[in-house]
Amino acid sequence: MRFFGREIELKELRKVRELSQERSRFTVLTGRRRVGKTELSREAFDDGKTPYLNLPITRQPEVTLCAQLQEEAERVLHLGIHGTCTRFGELFRELMKEAERRPYTLVIDEFQEFDRTNPGVYGDIQHIWDEYHNKTKLNLVVNGSVNRLMNKIFFDDSQPLYGRNTGTLILKPFGPSLLKEIFRCYKPDYTNSDLLALWTVSGGVARYVDMMMSAHAFTKAEMLEEIFSPLSAYIPEGRTILADEFGSDYGTYFTLLAAISAGQTTSAELKNLLGTEVGGFLAKLEDQYSIVEKKQPIFGKPTSKNAHFQVDDCFFRFWFRFVHKLSYLNELGRRDRMRDIAERDFGVFSGYALERYFTAKIVEDKGCTRIGSWWDRKGENEIDIVCEDEIAETLAFYEVKIDASRFDATRLAEKVEAFFAKNPDKRNLHYKTGLLSIGDM
């Protein structure tokens, strides 16, 4: 798949490159796996304006890794390094020395993998960076996919690289407008049902969008056929990513995510399931990993107990529901039955994805300053999307329905009255109500 969009990110990265020609800069580029960090770096810097060196860090002995990286550095930068570097610190020093002579960009891909190869590398980099960065012109960008490790490396004040980065860019999945642009390029006559299917299985993550587009899987049926095919790369993806992300705590986190996906969404339910306190694990799933969202009614108190947890990543929602839950069928070689079940349940399952789509679209269109859902404690009244524009002093209340014929305007008006009864300070704001359906995508 060719490169699409990312104009804001490209502008920021190229601005940093310009600044690095005065003094070295150290940028951390992070985001979930498969979101397109490597491709973004290449698009931003591999344009011939200054030399661009990309060094991918892989899981192998440091001596072997350094030999490969030194060979690549010598090829791209035409370095004349005497001897063979056996430690990355030795190679990094040579690369910093080169930046004394000329400006260039160095991208280190999967930077967190040094934690497995040799965690001492981070201390080596810190000492060398401190020695050289004020007298060199290096645009250093480190890419990392594992939030747990990247947060530890750069934002834990006990770690050597704490405070060394001069900037941080978090790359998000494609938003609705860019996803539509990509889909239109491959299938100009796509339908909104096709778009909803693509959003549901990919969540806008570049790798999974590419997976579908490259396979010419443009309809729901074609996407499900691709996902559950014998050669599918989608099936093992969830377990692979989570094992890397969670490390030794993999079992606990995996159990929590599976339970939340199955409908056990309150702290009490999850505590009973594991037989231990889960608050710390849930907080990390939300704050560090961005896989889970703690949902509570908009305008509610942060300490409110009227809250529940949801898997907030469309890919993982789909993977836990139709891959992990049906793993017994996969073990029997019956991916055809997995596909049939996904086809049968897709309409109900994709309702939440449609709600997330419209939430993302409203935010992307800058149509609010606060957005969320609202429900009362008894669960009798629930509004899918509530938006507030604090500048215009307005509110909007939306029901999200795949089938527009199921929308009940009178019932929504009753829910809005219940909302104002619980939030009387909002009653004087101008407001509107409406339906958001598949036709509005």
What are these regions (language model features)?
Residues M1-D336, D340:
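Phosphate-binding site recognition
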Residues K305-M441:
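A cross-kingdom feature that marks ATP-driven nucleic-acid transaction machinery
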